[in-house]
Regions:
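Short coil/turn segments at secondary-structure boundaries
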Residues: 54-58, 90-98, 118, 123
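Catalytic or ion-coupling anion/metal-binding cores of large enzyme and transporter domains
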Residues: 2-52, 56-58, 63-83, 89, ...
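N-terminal small/polar loop signature for handling phosphorylated ligands or for N-terminal nucleophile
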Residues: 80-113
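Glycine-rich, N-terminal phosphate-binding loop and its surrounding beta-alpha-beta segment
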Residues: 71, 105-109, 118
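A short, small-residue-rich loop immediately preceding and capping a beta-strand
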Residues: 110-131, 142-146
Length: 578
């Protein structure tokens, strides 16, 4: 690092002896702040997604206080500010609808204010990519502090995983093996503390992605939300944010193509969520890194899944932390030369390899397995292409049934999610265990927002027969806590005129994960005729933000960002407001 200290952005607010400097400093002082507290010091923004409507992030006020202490100790001045909290737990129709909105909030808050560096307080699923996208668009020094996973769920003396147990028990109710009272009894034991889902769902996956990308300190991903060490990490992150400003360590030096390759490999090792495919693409787009689905095949396929966590495995995030967390996984990969780019820089100024080469691994290789004893030998995201998904689709092998990953079945078609709900449990539905459930119009434009409805629950009559999985295909997403042989993110989506819109009841579809093929088994001429007969999707005139979303959202293979947000716009100081 250079010994020369960079010019502070905040000096263009507070460092001038003129009318503008007078006003900016004076307004800060109305909070009881003295000159020496902020004048000439790095101003560190604390970007907080706390909200009582986002239970996962309910403890962020306390975390922010510890970040502030770290900033002050390192000689900086902290300023906390709120941004849109797009938590998954309560927000309808889907938090994905507002991920880009939240990123715009973050970007404009950073650029328009006297902020030299920023600590991003993220937690629930979409908050991590949203804040990273916004910060990347500005390319300022930034460090991620996630809220951590909640405590293990407990029910009838056993551990239960948040999210995952909902899918399990709801299917058991439909199958008639438990009562609705049994189902509801588990409700109070699933979420026992603040924090994100305690499975390897999207929140934990994206926390691991942030750590693998190098944008958070080691162990950030797995420390439980209510563990005191979470506060210690927050304090250290505040200190480090000040040092990053002095070193001019911007996100563009960390979020390189090499960093994204590391994250893709890690996603395979941990059995991470398919949502990471969309989010990493969107983050990469904001910092100017080219990333596409072929990178997931090139880097991820063939990588064993060695983290034995639900929904792919047995354990929960508490056990993952006690076993050594992500640094232990990275050490295991590093010792086998499986980290693509161990020299990638991280926020603490060290490389990913340096941070993890001596990381301890605990627990007799149960939670974090050895590479020769994985839970799935080929756990990387499976990218599928074919006449049904010309721009691609994805499937998560670690959560799928191996016997179904090469399958040919007859399509049972639902034109939308409402039709699926209306028909799926109809005793007269023409479906058997070898059928393929196909759902349309659940993509970015069609839902809108690409909701997590792709893991369609199975027909009640098949559940009663003991069927536990079927091939399912849609242009939707699914929760990272879900499981099954589920083909997702079909692009182009049905609402954008993709071939998925042409599938008819009774068509035969072939899925071959080994070759990455998803094929609608009809003659090319027939498919061309169907495509020609497609009626242009009816333009939804909903107005407001949703109208903007529908008109500007990109397809899943492009990360579902807005077309006008792709690219890094930097943090050039705007003109004065007075």
């Amino acid at each position: 690092m250079s010994d020369k200290k960079p010019t502070l952005r905040s000096a263009q607010w507070f460092g001038t002896a003129d009318k503008n400097g007078f006003m900016y400093r004076s307004w800060m002082k109305n909070q009881g702040i003295a000159d020496h507290q902020f004048h000439g010091k790095p101003i560190i923004g604390i970007c907080n997604t706390w909200s009582e409507l986002t239970p996962c992030n309910a403890h962020f006020r306390q975390i922010a206080e510890h970040v502030k202490r770290g900033v002050i100790e390192a000689g900086g001045f902290p300023v906390e500010f709120p941004v849109f909290s797009n938590g998954e737990s309560n927000l309808r129709p889907t938090a994905m609808l507002t991920r880009n909105l939240a990123s715009m909030d973050v970007e404009e808050a950073i650029r328009g204010n006297p902020i030299d560096g920023v600590v991003l307080l993220t937690g629930c699923d979409k908050t991590t990519p949203a804040l990273l996208m916004g910060a990347a668009s500005c390319d300022v020094p930034a460090i991620v502090v996630t809220g951590g996973p909640m405590l293990n769920g407990k029910h009838k003396g056993k551990d239960i995983g948040s999210g995952t147990v909902v899918w399990q028990l709801s299917e058991q109710v439909k199958a008639g093996t438990i009562t609705i009272d049994d189902f509801l009894a588990a409700e109070g034991g699933m979420s026992r503390s603040a924090g994100t889902c305690n499975t390897m769902g999207t929140a934990s996956t994206m926390a691991c992605m942030a750590e693998a990308l190098g944008t958070s300190l080691p162990h950030n991903a797995a420390i439980p939300a209510v563990d005191a060490r979470r506060y210690v990490l927050a304090h250290m992150s505040g200190m480090r944010a000040v040092e990053m400003v002095r070193e001019d360590l911007k996100l563009s030096k960390i979020l390189t193509k090499e960093a994204f390759e590391n994250a893709i490999r890690v996603n395979a090792a941990i059995g991470g969520s398919t949502n990471a495919v969309i989010h990493l693409k969107a983050i990469a787009g904001r910092i100017g890194v080219e990333l596409d689905l072929d990178d997931w095949t090139r880097i991820g396929r063939g990588m064993p899944t060695i983290v034995d966590l639900q929904p792919s495995g047995r354990f929960l995030m508490e056990e993952f932390y006690y076993a050594g967390g992500l640094p232990a996984v990275l050490r295991r990969l590093g010792e086998a030369n499986l980290i693509p780019n161990p020299n990638a820089l991280t926020v603490n100024g060290k490389t990913l390899g340096e941070n993890t080469k001596d990381a301890p691994i605990y627990g007799e290789d149960e939670v974090i397995r050895t590479l020769d004893n994985p839970i799935r030998a080929d756990g990387g995201i499976c990218v599928l292409r074919g006449n049904l998904a010309p721009l691609g689709a994805v499937l998560k092998p670690s959560a799928a049934t191996p016997e179904l990953m090469q399958h040919r079945g007859r399509a049972v078609v639902f034109e939308n999610f409402d039709m699926y709900k209306a028909r799926i449990n109809d005793p007269e539905l023409d479906v058997d265990k070898d059928s393929i459930l196909v759902m349309k119009n659940c993509g970015p434009k069609g839902y809108p927002g690409m909701a997590e409805v792709g893991n369609m629950g199975l027909p009640a009559k098949l559940l009663a027969q003991g069927v536990t999985d079927m091939v399912r295909i849609s242009d939707a997403r699914m929760s990272g806590t879900a499981y099954g042989t589920v083909v997702l993110h079909v692009a182009p989506e049905a609402a954008a005129g993709g071939p998925l819109a042409t599938v008819k009841e009774g068509d035969w579809i072939e899925l071959d994960c080994a070759s990455g093929r998803l094929h609608l088994d009809i003659p090319d001429a027939e498919l061309a005729a169907r495509m020609a007969d497609l009626q242009p999707p009816q333009q939804l005139l909903v107005g407001g933000y949703r109208q903007l979303y529908i008109e500007h959202v990109l397809q899943a293979d492009q990360g579902c960002d807005f077309d006008f947000l792709v690219g890094c716009r930097g943090a050039e100081v705007p003109r004065h407001s007075h």
